[in-house]
């Protein structure tokens, strides 16, 4: 019966061996055991033996023998009994029955794989050289049983081999060893070799020294000594050189053969000298700036005020601030709680004052101020720009108002040419023209708003007709015309109502895809 931990295919080999033994036993039966000499008649029965023996025989008296006679009695008295010779090895008949070759196997057995033996059989070995013996040994190891099955304790069978003295050269010449360094030695620091000296000229003397191979190495007494290879070696006696003292005992060498370490005495100090405090030592250190001094100290020695000089430099180099523009700056404000007043107060006390804030816009002025200086009305310009953004035809009311305004302007020129600019008739005509222009602006804004609100995405085509007439919305015109003034004294123009509400679709033509014709017809119906 094959063992459960046997090799691969062991059960098949055992079964074949049993079949061969059974066939051999059937072909050659075992011979009958030889009969005893004389047959059964040579052994008397119990009764005959008792009668033949007669009565109880008298016991013979023993004979006294010496030790020497006792040892030689058996050899001299009777010849030694020769043990029957046992046949060694197999008989000629058994030798003839042994198989002369492998058993012939059927095709099924040949096709059937036996474990890992057939794995990689069709591959050809690659490479060559020193690695061939390894591959052959590896192939032969496949037939052998596993090491895990042979031994229960692997550490017991581990063999210890001491490391050779010249292991470094052996490794370089013969290639890598089969075992690792962890298997060869238990203490790695025992065979660790010292590194060569960084400055070989500062050793005990001149000469040559080799770390691991042959060469020359000088001893402490002079001459050459071989460390591990060939070379010359001189006794560590005194040297004949003039620089060495004759009869001097050489200094003891360390285990590694390096020069001895120098043990120097501490430096001697004068006991009468007083110790220097640490503060003075720190002061005595050279300054990285040399004899340079701070700028403030240099100016103070010259009798100059560095604060005034900085103020003059700032005035020359700083850009013009917002004081030149029409808008007031918080840094230059005269209010008591403003930052500018605080800065001026600090500067008056003599403390270092903060630098004035520079206007990032420089001399730039607001748009409204620039237009007023040019004699243009920025309100009309803004209304004109807003009106251009609305795509609608000019209404009849707007046309009539524009014609009346143009006629009044012509009359005003004639009156000014006849009566002069300061006449009352000219003032009345100019006031009437300004009123009609305001009325025209209100009408334009109202019609533009209807178009903008009519183009909202959620509104229909007839939403514009639902707005009340213009006469019932005087507050809308006030919201657009009477605008609050800014803090700097310049009027600013707020955003239109539709922009404040977030409706920007009317700025672009056809942005919401609404029909323009339907909106125009609905607005005309509302007029």
From Swiss-Prot:
Q: Which InterPro entries match?
A: EIF-4B_pln
Answer yes or no on keyword Protein biosynthesis: yes
Q: Where in the cell is it found?
A: Nucleus
Name the Gene Ontology molecular function terms of this record: mRNA binding; protein homodimerization activity; translation initiation factor activity
Explain the post-translational modification. Answer: Phosphorylated.
**In its keyword annotation, does this UniProt entry include RNA-binding?**
no
Region ranges (Disordered): 1-370, 453-527
Q: Name one GO cellular component term.
A: nucleus
At the top level, the lineage of the source is: Eukaryota
* Protein family according to the UniProt entry: Belongs to the eIF-4 subunit B family.
Q: How does it assemble?
A: Homodimer. Nonspherical monomer. mRNA-discriminating component of initiation complexes.
- Explain the purpose of this protein: Promotes the eIF4F and eIF4A RNA-dependent ATP-hydrolysis activity with different efficiency depending on mRNAs, thus providing mRNA discrimination during initiation of translation.
Protein name per the record: Eukaryotic translation initiation factor 4B1
Query: Origin organism of this chain?
Result: Triticum aestivum (Wheat)
Please name the gene that encodes this protein.
EIF4B
